[in-house]
Regions:
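A short glycine/serine-rich beta->alpha loop
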Residues: 49-54, 110-114, 233-235, 271-272
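Residue-level recognition of the N-termini of beta-strands and the immediately preceding loop/turn
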Residues: 76-78, 142, 233-234
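Alpha-helix termini
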Residues: 33-36, 70-77, 131-136, 221-230, ...
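An extended, acidic
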Residues: 19, 23-26, 30, 96, ...
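DPxDG-like acidic metal-binding loop motif
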Residues: 97-165
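Buried hydrophobic packing segments
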Residues: 65, 69, 124-128, 248, ...
Length: 338
């Protein structure tokens, strides 16, 4: 006989399988859509929501996602939370149906801007948390899956998943041969930034000078000074928070920092051009792989499971790099943005 607490636990294995299958289906829908439409159609603005701007490339994927959630709701009670939906999410199924209710935080296409111009992969992100109503937090997520959405020039796509308490898993899908092979997920073991990628998000106009000054200050202190004859730390402005975390988890980046909400506060402006909780829906993939995810001051990252909260975050490839950088980042962020 199951204990009462065991009966209320989410079925992690089932959720991983379902989310992987759903994301692979959405990836296929998107590839067909991209193959049949031009850049002008994909990049057109469809609507502006509280969460973000919805472009033409988003529409087909959104429609398929909602259709599949309706079918899933025939056997499971859950609430879908994502941009473009009702502020409190959309409820599927009814109480008592299936396993314990959960909230599914989704960003169907994280990195839209790069993908709609066929420049760089985006990612489909999902994270499931026990349903605690409006009090559900980002850190409550127990299961996460993220799937690479490649450009039309690319036939390989990575799929990453994580369950709380388990090592991150991965697969590399060959979209031509329709095969999948195991993919090891291991962050960099480097103990510093030398000859590695370390980036401070600085995508859009407004506050760029402040962010650049912060970026320089962190790198200079971390490296013990600046050598004008050497390129020792590299920056990658990947307009995709989920993609940034994947780069760290897969060992390609050592550090990423996004302080845009703090910059807007410093400038005395309100802006939605920032990371939102749904952009971090699959952050469990990075943390279960061994990365250190926190706020810019080194405190645990906390955010509601919604679509409107601006989130500042830092991700370090390993504990050694975090120990090196957290004090530097904290001091420089406080000095420049405090």
């Amino acid at each position: 006989m199951l204990r009462a607490d065991a009966m209320t636990k989410l079925d992690h294995q089932d959720l991983v399988a379902r989310m992987c299958a759903l994301q692979r289906e959405l990836r296929g829908v998107l590839r067909e859509h991209m193959a049949s439409q031009g850049v002008e159609h994909l990049s057109r603005t469809v609507r502006d929501d509280k969460g973000d701007t919805i472009f033409g490339i988003d529409v087909e994927v959104e429609e398929r996602l909602l259709r599949r959630c309706e079918e899933w709701g025939e056997e499971q009670h859950f609430t879908l939370v994502g941009e473009g939906l009702a502020e409190g999410g959309v409820e599927f199924g009814r109480s008592g149906r299936g396993g314990p209710p959960f909230r599914l935080l989704v960003d169907p296409i994280d990195g839209t801007r790069g993908l709609m111009f066929d420049k760089r992969s985006a990612w489909c992100l999902m994270g499931a948390a026990p349903d605690r109503g409006p009090d559900t937090q980002l850190q409550d997520i127990e299961v996460a899956v993220m799937t690479e959405l490649p450009t039309t020039r690319q036939n390989i796509s990575d799929v990453l998943w994580a369950s709380r308490g388990e090592a991150t898993g991965g697969a590399r899908d060959d979209l031509v041969r329709e095969t999948s092979t195991a993919l090891g997920v291991a962050p960099s073991g480097a103990r510093d930034l030398r000859h590695g990628f370390a980036s401070v998000s600085n995508y859009f106009a407004g506050g760029k000078a402040l962010i650049a000054e912060l970026d320089d200050a962190i790198a200079t202190r971390a490296m013990g000074g600046w050598n004008p004859d050497k390129a020792e730390v590299y920056s990658d402005q990947y307009i995709c928070s989920g993609g940034q975390l994947a780069e760290v988890a897969l060992g390609r980046d050592r550090f990423v920092l996004d302080v845009r909400p703090l910059v807007y506060t410093k400038l005395g402006v309100a802006s939605s051009l920032a990371c939102r909780p749904y952009d971090l829906a699959a952050s469990l993939v990075a943390t279960q792989a061994g990365c250190v995810l926190c706020d810019p001051f080194g405190a645990p990252l906390r955010a509601p499971l919604d679509v409107t909260t601006n989130v500042a975050f830092a991700c370090y490839a390993n504990r050694a790099i975090a120990d090196l950088l957290v004090p530097i980042v904290r001091e420089e962020v406080t000095r420049l943005l405090g």
